[in-house]
């Protein structure tokens, strides 16, 4: 593969994700109500939804979480085959990675969904392969993974229909909040680590695209990850649309070398620094900028005025590969949080902490024990009707 003068390459085809999708036990074929095969992925499967429900019993989750997933699967069973005609557009939720995400209503059940539309000009065989690979998502049922209703192809677009998270993505929340409190970030990180561990241990899936816009929250306080790489063919077909994603990629991915789930750890660490200080941390902000972020009036003033100059994309990627990684240096952050970020952002993947180490880190242990009202914080930040009493939602 040829490299540019900065010794960087575009992200390679994801052979690992393709292999992972191929090695996972296939979901039983989905059928239309009449029993004929369809390119939609949400007809009722030959095996009942009970088969998926049974798999929940062996997973590490609480009774409330298990009950919520069972309710989701029950709703999913009632929907039947998905098609464009059955989805009423309610508004746009966001865009990125070559697609737009719409809020839609399923007209027969009145269920609200998030529909991601990805425009693809591909041959029929490629289209079928993408739909086939996306079937793996039916198997991904976990408290910290966004639920999947199905996918279909219509008018040159792949539609992926997912669970609607009314709090939105963390990049949108970050714009509203200015920065995200450490106590909130602790719970978010715990959820992301559990989600990544589930994908790896149960489905041999590497996420490949961890960043704030792919971490979603809702007014019930749930935290879920989305947009992970189950379809190697879809990733390959969209290879030129991942400009924003590259800024969160690990040095080894940017250099085109072998990568693993350790690459997701780098992306998580970089995302944490961004959410903690309220701005993308490469190049790092100077002392004056940091002081303006954490000044007493920072919550009212929004983003600091003296931000680092914007870098061209290849200049930015060269910085990620060749310069020291970002750090959390302000005194407002705990020592444990700073250490957690540091072990996520080691330049060499074999020196970077793994998922097991991170899940047992003192900062995560503290987050598990600390009472933090994610629901109240989300509702307060995004002006949503409160669903639980608010407690411990202060910014520090």
Curated annotation (Swiss-Prot):
Keywords: ATP-binding, Developmental protein, Kinase, Nucleotide-binding, Phosphoprotein, Serine/threonine-protein kinase, Transferase, Tyrosine-protein kinase. The modification Phosphoserine is found at residues 237, 241. ATP binds at residues 93-101, 116. Residues 25-44 are annotated as: Disordered. GO terms for cellular component: condensed chromosome; cytosol. Signal peptide: none annotated. It comes from the Eukaryota. Residues 87-364 form the Protein kinase domain. It is an enzyme of class 2 (transferase). Gene3D superfamilies: Phosphorylase Kinase, domain 1 (3.30.200.20), Transferase(Phosphotransferase) domain 1 (1.10.510.10). Phosphorylation on Ser/Thr by MAP kinase kinase kinases regulates positively the kinase activity. The active site is at residue 209. GO terms for biological process: border follicle cell migration; cellular response to X-ray; defense response to virus; determination of adult lifespan; dorsal/ventral pattern formation; epidermal growth factor receptor signaling pathway; ERK1 and ERK2 cascade; fibroblast growth factor receptor signaling pathway. One of its GO terms (molecular function) is protein serine/threonine kinase activity. Transmembrane segments: none annotated. It catalyses: L-seryl-[protein] + ATP = O-phospho-L-seryl-[protein] + ADP + H(+); L-threonyl-[protein] + ATP = O-phospho-L-threonyl-[protein] + ADP + H(+); L-tyrosyl-[protein] + ATP = O-phospho-L-tyrosyl-[protein] + ADP + H(+). InterPro entries: Kinase-like_dom_sf, MAP_kinase_kinase, Prot_kinase_dom, Protein_kinase_ATP_BS, Ser/Thr_kinase_AS. Its EC number is 2.7.12.2. Interacts with Raf and ksr; Dsor1 binding to ksr probably promotes ksr and Raf dimerization and ksr-mediated Raf transactivation. Required downstream of Raf in the sevenless (sev), torso (tor), and Drosophila EGF receptor homolog (DER) signal transduction pathways. Involved in both positive regulation (at the posterior terminus) and negative regulation (at the anterior domain) of tll, as in other terminal class gene products, maybe via the ERK-A kinase. Belongs to the protein kinase superfamily. STE Ser/Thr protein kinase family. MAP kinase kinase subfamily. This is Dual specificity mitogen-activated protein kinase kinase dSOR1.
